[in-house]
């Protein structure tokens, strides 16, 4: 394993603070390194592997598509993209879909759609977007510009212009930023990197009403919190606060790089048209075959029902841990997107857990994030808690 790490350090750009293991294969909710060591995975590729590793039906669908065609071009139609779009419309309630290669690309498309929508209304080119402090939407320039964390933005100024920031769950702070030039409000329905902070029902409904009154587009980023993780296919469905534009990725492809931004018909009819936006690989047959099969398996395997059964148990066990240790300030989160907030940095705890065969990740310096495969069991939760308990002691 050490020789692989040495080679990577020599050849790869140093943009990640990687843990000192080399992962080689997965099975169910477990990963194995190149030395054969087994790990219980409560990260799932950062909320990606909803179905776990080596799901046979999923793998078979990808193999079958590889044997047909992997990529064509968006100058032509392909059946997997048509079927995937139909199925994602059904579960999301949105009207139009654009497939991308990643979540960041989906956010870029959402921003462009909102600005074009506003431009067609009044011809102005100085429209404003309101985003949330502590948010994270991606590292491309547009997505970074609406990311409300200065540490990600500082070295890459100037950002795209006319972006303002408000506080999640503080409606007055949003009102304070609204002007006649506001074209969109963007937020994660549950903030991930920002500390597992859910937008509450009252706030979401107030923002939705404001957007309706002022013809402002509401963009909800469901890249991490979507695809069943909160016990609903998309987190906004908990409260019925439907966005005008929505982004999705991560578990949408369960390992195959794919994202999407979706919109209501009123936005689609008055925003992006031919030549406004495009992608070489987005919507390719292989990625869309993955999306299609993921959505089928969510229904066939009753994934959301399972999340609703196991998530309360995870919350209970995390609450017990929080009650046991004074250094844990609180538990936050929804469904299988949880966090424990500590009064000190959590890096050492995560490293000790890794040594004991448990994969965890942080969300900021003082929060351990839990975003496991959606197929985990109560027994997996118990095993995780037992290991984590020994790492905190």
Residue ranges and their predicted role:
Residues 1-393:
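Conserved N-terminal phosphate-binding loop of PLP-dependent enzymes in the Aspartate aminotransferase
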């Amino acid at each position: 394993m050490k020789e692989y790490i040495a080679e990577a350090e020599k050849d790869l750009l140093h943009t990640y603070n990687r843990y000192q293991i080399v992962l080689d294969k997965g099975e169910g909710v477990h990963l194995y390194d190149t030395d054969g060591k087994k790990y219980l995975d409560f990260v799932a590729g950062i909320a990606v592997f909803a179905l776990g590793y080596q799901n046979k039906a999923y793998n078979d669908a990808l193999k079958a598509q590889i044997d047909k065609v992997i990529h064509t071009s968006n100058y032509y139609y392909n059946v997997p993209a048509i079927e995937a779009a139909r199925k994602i419309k059904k579960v999301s309630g949105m009207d139009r879909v654009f497939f991308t290669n990643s979540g960041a690309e989906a956010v870029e498309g959402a921003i462009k759609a909102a600005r074009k929508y506003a431009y067609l209304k009044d011809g102005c080119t100085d429209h404003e977007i309101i985003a949330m402090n502590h948010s994270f939407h991606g590292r491309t320039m547009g997505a970074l510009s609406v990311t409300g964390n200065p540490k990600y933005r500082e070295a890459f100024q100037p950002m795209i212009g006319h972006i303002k920031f408000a506080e999640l769950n503080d409606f007055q702070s949003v009102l304070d930023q609204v002007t006649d030039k506001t074209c969109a409000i963007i937020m994660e329905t549950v903030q991930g990197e920002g500390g597992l902070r859910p937008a509450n029902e009252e706030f979401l409904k107030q923002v939705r009403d404001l957007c309706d009154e002022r013809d402002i587009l509401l963009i909800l980023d469901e890249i991490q919190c979507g695809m069943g993780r909160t016990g609903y296919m998309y987190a906004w469905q908990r409260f019925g606060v439907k966005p005008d534009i929505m982004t999705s990725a991560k578990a949408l492809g369960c390992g195959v790089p794919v994202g999407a931004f979706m919109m209501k018909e009123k936005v689609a009819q008055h925003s992006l048209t031919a030549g406004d936006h495009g992608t070489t690989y987005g919507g390719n047959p292989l990625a869309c075959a993955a999306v299609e099969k993921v959505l089928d398996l969510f229904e066939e395997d009753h994934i959301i029902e399972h999340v609703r059964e196991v998530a309360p148990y995870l919350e209970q066990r995390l609450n017990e841990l929080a009650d046991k240790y004074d250094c844990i300030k609180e538990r936050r989160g929804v469904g299988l997107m949880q966090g424990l907030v500590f009064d000190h940095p959590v890096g050492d705890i995560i490293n000790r857990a890794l040594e004991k065969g448990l994969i965890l990740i942080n969300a900021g310096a003082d929060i351990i994030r839990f975003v496991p495969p959606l197929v985990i069991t109560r027994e997996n939760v118990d095993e995780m808690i037992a290991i984590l308990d020994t790492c905190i002691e």
